[in-house]
Amino acid sequence: VLTITINRPDKLNALNKTVIEELHTVLDSFYKHPEMKAAILTGAGPKSFVAGADISEFLELDATGGAALAAKGQEQVFSKIENSPKPIIAAVNGFALGGGCELAMACHFRLASEQAKFGQPEVNLGLIPGYGGTQRLTQLVGKGKAMELMMTGAMINASEALQLGLVNYVTPAEELLPKTNSLLQTIIHKAPLAISEIIRLTNLAAIGAENGLQEEINAFGRLFDTADAKEGASAFLEKRPAVFKGK
């Protein structure tokens, strides 16, 4: 399991162009190395996961530059995480605001420490979320609550995030990474091809794709042709643990 740490603690791990480019490089490497089965995304230091974008970069932007910034981030990082065929889980260790909340939401699911805080405060800058926040927050917490959080720019704590379904677990700070790692250890011992299909099909469901059920039927059928499916059935009938190879 790879651990990816956003490491700008002096800037509360804010996302700037350099961080986006570095994340893109790391994700590319993660995709290409079959021995890396899953990844944890977290922030350095005790205070912050990612406290938004680097606002100092905003002053020079116009409409074209703003749209280009959002498009590049979406393509190189946020959509790349969401559509990763291998699980990427966020371990939110502190502030996850603006682009930080969006980064956590792009992950397949999220765990948070008791100190974590979430919010989309872009409205306070006369802006809106630009890295998928309007879409993913709505998918995760529902239209009404997403509207309220984005319109007020309010921050919520970890227990509220848990209640809303924004995070799956809340742990004491020192248990956050061990708990995330333990969940991933369970997942990486399952069949990798099935996990990839679960990610792809669940993402289709989240965007309300009309062909989701047909895609599921097709994928269900395809998996019967895999060595892993044969191994899974044999192991079950022989009452032994399955050993999946991703084939």
Residue ranges and their predicted role:
Residues 79-193, 209, 222, 226, ...:
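Crotonase-fold acyl-CoA enzyme core
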Residues 1-42, 61, 79:
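Conserved CoA-thioester-binding segment of acyl-CoA-metabolizing enzymes
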Residues 4, 8, 22-23, 41, ...:
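Terminal peptide-recognition signature
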Residues 241-247:
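Short C-terminal tail/terminal secondary-structure segment
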Residues 35, 43-80, 96, 208:
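Glycine- (often His-adjacent) and acidic-residue-rich active-site loop
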Residues 18, 22, 73, 80, ...:
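Charged catalytic carboxylate motif
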